[in-house]
Amino acid sequence: MSKSYSYLFSGTKGSITHDKSVIEKVSRGKLKAWAKDKMASLTGKAKSSFNTACIVYDESTGKCYYGRNGGYKENGYTKNPLLFGDDTHDGILPKSPLNKFPVGNCAEVDAVNKALNAGAKLKDLHLTTIHVTKRAFGEYKASCENCKYTFKGRVKENYSGWVDN
């Protein structure tokens, strides 16, 4: 992808805002643009299975991180131990799926994982998740049961909401 999506506000490297209405509006717009570019860069099964995208805004740095469903399957993916655990500690993801999707498959997990690997703290993160299917492109998509278990009460905000159980 040729465009830069690193910061929420282009041309203002490191600009930070705490205004939730601004974050929500700008995040969603950037996410839609990123998702279109990402879709255009994918082929085969990766393209046909891409149905969800997430942007994570770190309010402490102004940086953005993007994720897609199935992103953890990409080559070179580094699983953050806070999420996935390690040899000595369990991660905060559920041990087994709370729905029909594999634990760690979600766009939210992909984006948050990237943010954590860059040094972000969960308490500073704002999440926005959208559908990227032709039928519902750009519409908000509530975070699933696995993500609700993992992130609700730990992240600053989720503009797409949480699935109802």
Can you annotate each of these PLM segments?
Residues S4-N165:
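Zinc-dependent deaminase catalytic domain
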